[in-house]
Curated annotation (Swiss-Prot):
The keyword Nucleotidyltransferase applies. Catalyzes the formation of 4-diphosphocytidyl-2-C-methyl-D-erythritol from CTP and 2-C-methyl-D-erythritol 4-phosphate (MEP). The keyword Membrane does not apply. The gene is ispD. It comes from the Bacteria. CDD domains: CDP-ME_synthetase (cd02516). This is 2-C-methyl-D-erythritol 4-phosphate cytidylyltransferase. The record marks R16, K24 as: Transition state stabilizer.
Amino acid sequence: MGKIAGLVVAGGGGSRITNSVLPKQYLQVRGKAILQYTVEALFAHPKIECVHLVVNSKCEVHYLPILRNLSGYVVSLSEAGNTRTDSVFSGLKALECLNPSHVLIQDAARPFTTPKVINAVIKSLLEGCEGVVPVVPVQDTIIKREPEGIVTDVNRDELRIVQTPQGFDFCKIFAAYKAHFMCPSKRYTDDGSLALAHGIKVECIPGDSSNLKITHPFDLKFADFLLAQSHR
């Protein structure tokens, strides 16, 4: 078995967090940056040997202290692109020299990914899955608004909320990204969708409702609550 690498997409420059001038991945919860929690969660799995961060060099003053805190781990960097897809491709190109067998692609602002989810993704990959995406059921009622203003019901039993980390056979996802950039015809917001569009077989596994992506002000408060509970 080859190396399993983590790839954390941390190049986002915007934030929906009220009154924040920092990208959300650098905001602190209980004295630690969200990005550091995210990286440490990956390294907590014994099979993940290295983590690559895709960052915006303009945020150097924010990510260098995090790197110092992670000095005991194998962490590398590359420059983020204009879109998430650009950034993931940047990270995959940087990881190519390490020749990993698999890669877990993670959002920077998911600090509470559980060992159970990470282990399930890796287990599925090692059992032969080409791509693995954690998902959770939709709890709310969903409607679809048509252009004419007509609203139709959507069967939520058929829907799932997609989470990360999403795991892939490295060679297959790298080939899919190269094919996409040879003829970019669509914008993708997650790696599983791009993988499916390029012929990779993607399996869904159960995610975890606590694996939230920090996006809104309430998420920060909830993150603080979760950490308070975990340290009791």
